């Protein structure tokens, strides 16, 4: 009898037939799939409503007044928080709750903990957005939102750390797991800093806006300290299979994480130019370690998704390089707000969003009950629009904000609408996938 069957029988307290074991396992799988769909649907809601739509509204105001100061900093910070924590953060928690029991071959987590985590995380991110936009009772709700997010992550961490993998014959954890752990530490640091900043702002009582200098450093921690290592870790796990790459250079990936961590710490200390150089070295080493610029070992696995999937994955890492190069340029000149904004957008949309669009539409249908992606053509359409919109946004932000070309102000709302269409298509494609019947049910 298998180890899984033994655990199921131990929990039942009696000997079970093969059919009973299969039925128990099937019910657990369905419960985890429904939980994942809940997290992903919540992330899509944050992506579309407080994230993208508020961002479009901000750009329309900026374009019409031809100045970035026409929109309050709190609105911009609320938009960014909804995108980073409400969208991608919720995705990461959902995938973590679903996949970690699978990867470690153990019993699923107690679902009550996952539900409480979802409630706290969703409430925290929603309250953060509401206080940034409406400022109602912000001295109470701002630190409360940060406390909710921190508590949700601590519950998630407790669930993860409470389980141990079976002996697989390997010495120590796999390298991609170490990278994900580094990212989790970065997320914890981000949430702690966010909670401390919220308390400070609430006690001071002057404004709910983060000071510009601190906000710039905090964004480095959020993106490079938390999101980028997560992408690298999951890239190391999935890309060799999906793209047909040669085995990754594991030590090289750890070196990339080390260089990236030095860059983040240097940025938090205020040495921005040196920090961006370290970040550039990290992203370049990660491309080498993942072998993204090398010939593939075998054909890419594109069944169920568009065949252009590998192209967009590689283009995402190119956007990461562009983001750091723009950061070096911005740190070398004065009044470089437009260049900094373009650098952040190249990272958050060009790199991070493109990876979410690519990998998400590849794995989430299978995780949600072995479904098939609703439309590979919609996948291509969303990725093309996202790339075009990002290219327009990055170029127009530099040209307009830096005073190189006045006509570039009119490109900003165009880029925003294109990107809004892209995320809408992405969201619709996933939602239609979730409401469709899995192939097994169709056959029955």
Mark where each language-model region is.
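Hydrophobic alpha-helical transmembrane segments of multi-pass integral membrane proteins
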Residues: 1-444
């Amino acid at each position: 009898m298998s180890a899984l069957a033994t655990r199921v029988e131990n929990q039942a307290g009696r000997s079970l037939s093969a059919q009973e074991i299969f039925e128990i396992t099937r019910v657990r799988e369905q419960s985890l799939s429904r939980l994942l769909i809940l997290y992903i649907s919540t992330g899509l809601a944050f992506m579309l409503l407080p994230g993208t739509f508020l961002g479009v509204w901000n750009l329309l105001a900026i374009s019409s007044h031809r100045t970035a100061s026409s929109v309050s900093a709190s609105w911009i910070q609320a938009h960014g928080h909804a995108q980073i924590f409400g969208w991608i953060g919720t995705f990461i928690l959902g995938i973590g709750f679903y996949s970690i029991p699978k990867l470690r071959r153990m019993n699923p987590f107690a679902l009550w903990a996952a539900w409480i985590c979802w409630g706290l995380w969703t409430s925290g991110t929603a309250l953060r957005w509401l206080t940034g936009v409406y400022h109602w009772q912000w001295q109470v709700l701002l630190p409360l939102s940060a406390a909710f997010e921190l508590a949700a992550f601590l519950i998630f961490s407790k669930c993860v750390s409470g389980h141990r993998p079976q002996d697989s014959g390997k010495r120590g954890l796999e390298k991609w797991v170490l990278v994900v752990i580094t990212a989790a530490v970065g997320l914890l640091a981000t949430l702690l800093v966010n909670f401390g900043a919220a308390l400070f702002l609430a006690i001071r009582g002057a404004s709910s806006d983060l000071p510009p200098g601190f906000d710039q450093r905090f964004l480095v921690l959020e993106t490079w300290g938390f999101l980028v290592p997560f992408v690298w870790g999951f890239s190391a796990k999935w890309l060799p299979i999906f793209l047909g790459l040669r085995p990754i250079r594991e030590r090289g990936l750890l070196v990339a994480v080390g260089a990236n961590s030095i860059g983040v710490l240097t940025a938090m200390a205020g040495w921005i130019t040196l920090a961006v150089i370290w970040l550039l070295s990290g992203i370049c080493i990660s491309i080498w370690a993942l072998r993204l610029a090398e010939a593939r070992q075998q054909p890419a696995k594109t069944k169920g998704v568009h065949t252009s999937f590998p192209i967009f994955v590689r283009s995402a890492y190119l956007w990461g390089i562009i983001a750091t190069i723009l950061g070096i340029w911005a740190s070398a000149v004065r009044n470089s707000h437009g260049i900094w904004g373009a650098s952040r957008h190249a990272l958050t949309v060009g790199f991070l969003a493109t990876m979410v669009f690519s990998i998400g539409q590849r794995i989430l249908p299978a995780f949600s009950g072995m479904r098939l992606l609703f439309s590979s053509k919609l996948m291509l359409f969303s990725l093309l629009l996202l790339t075009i919109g990002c290219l327009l946004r990055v170029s127009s932000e530099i040209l307009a904000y830096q005073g190189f070309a006045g006509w570039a102000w009119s490109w900003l709302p165009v880029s925003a609408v294109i990107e809004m269409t892209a995320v809408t298509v992405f969201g619709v494609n996933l939602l239609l996938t979730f409401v469709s019947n899995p192939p097994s049910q169709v056959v029955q």
